[in-house]
Amino acid sequence: MERSKACPDCRLGPQRRRGDTLERMNRKGRIRHSLAYWCLNATDWQWSIDRICENAMLLGCVSVELAPPELWPVVFRHGLKNALSLNGMPDPVFARGLNNLKYHEEVIARTKAMIDQSADNGVPNVIAFTGYKWREAGDPGSGEIPKSEGADNTVKGLRELAQYAAPRNVTIVLEQLNTRDDSHPMKGHPGYQGDDIDYCAEIVRQVDSPHAKLLFDVYHVAIMNGDVIRRLRQYAKWIGHIHVAGVPGRGELDDCQEIHYPAVMRTLVEIGYTGYVGQEFIPTRDPDAGLAEAIEACDV
């Protein structure tokens, strides 16, 4: 199947034009659209923060997320919000996590520092991870942390972070990642303990705080669990943030992938979700056209 192609003389896809001036798209207002910084900057496209923000504005997005704190002033200068911040850990940020008591001191300290920065800048969410399942995060030969032990440790750490975040009006969102795709370091994460949305949801349920929720990544959930719409309804009260990408491959939200995103977005509206939807796909072609298609597919 051939991928769809954008009009060659329309660099930014379907934004309306008034003379030679690009005009911001008006959206329906039921979905709060966000662009993930790393997908456009830390990949082959290497877009600057200004270009990402300009595209976000023109597409009718309200946020650019996951940019480092030193770039937040640029995001705000463009009239955008930052829906989600990183946890302050060195790359890969998901390797050393809350499932391993050995890393608790570092992870909790760094995450608390990000909570403070987020609170000071009106950023509502900070990401969290279970981490890899090995005793030494980077060493598969070091022995595995049992899933029950990893869950207990994550509950303990997440509860402390939620208590710290609550008076600062920040929410910690725990992300499930898939462990099946080993084709690319950002398409799948073999060894990550929290690879099951049911496992992560139970952790959040046990923490029992409005400031600890799920980051429901449709791409990862579809690969590991499937039954996306049923799980959105099942875990509605615990969902704090949404990520989307094409399945499989983490590419565009086009007709070469299997998720019908308009139905997913309508489900979010039906369950009363009012958070952000972050476009976190890795472009395989002209990002301008791919982003325009993705936002259009998700604007219900």
How does the language model describe each region?
Residues 39, 54, 59-160, 167, ...:
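Structural motif corresponding to the early beta-alpha repeats
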